[in-house]
Amino acid sequence: MKNAPLTLNFGSVRLPVSADGLLHAPTAQQQLGLTQSWEAALVEHGLPETYRDFGAGPEAAVSVPDFVALAFALDTPEARRWQKRARELLARAMQGDVRVAAQIAERNPEPDARRWLAARLESTGARRELLATVARHGGEGRVYGQLGSISNRTVLGKDSASVRQERGVKATRDGLTSAELLRLAYIDTVTARAIQESEARGNAAILTLHEQVARSERQSWERAGQVQRVG
């Protein structure tokens, strides 16, 4: 049984793609309005010569980053259209257009990646709500960083700097799993609610409350883990 060809969809454009994510060079060449031979273009722009099987035997291929580099290096009408698309996409991303994230997620074939994005957004939203609650209740200065440290040590067993170094990320949350993100979101949500219900005010009261919440949740997770191991 022959597998259906893989494609990368960008708006109305459909680009054949190999199993490891390289684009079909003849199609890319047409999309960019490149009239010179593909081999000459590779030499001129210092790109590697690569081949993949797109269903009819080995054919020239190009990576997505190299395709983008060509799109900005060329001055054809087709390349300028790609440049315009890129500028519009960057502007939307900088303005926080969530439809950009949705479109990217839809193109990702991995269900785990989409679940991670949902957990990442939930975690970010919970943290923002916690910080807003802290500000309304007189929190200021170092308390914001201290809250994050307590949460990270509770969920991850280490501080943010260690996590970033070990997992090779610049932003701590980018290196966390879906489960870790959801646990952080839960702790932040419970703390925000507790601050409001107890009417806690000031850094000391807020930190004490957050430590109590974090300790309670940690103990709950540890008990749940012990039950699962026994079962």
UniProtKB/Swiss-Prot annotation:
It comes from the Bacteria. Coiled coil: none annotated. One of its GO terms (cellular component) is cytoplasm. It is found in: Cytoplasm, Nucleoid. Changing residue 142 to E: Retains two distinct DNA binding sites similar to wild-type DdrC, with a high- and a low-affinity site, but shows a reduced high-affinity DNA binding site. Changing residue 14 to E: Exhibits only one DNA binding site, no longer retaining the low-affinity site, and shows reduced binding to the high-affinity site. This is DNA damage response protein C.
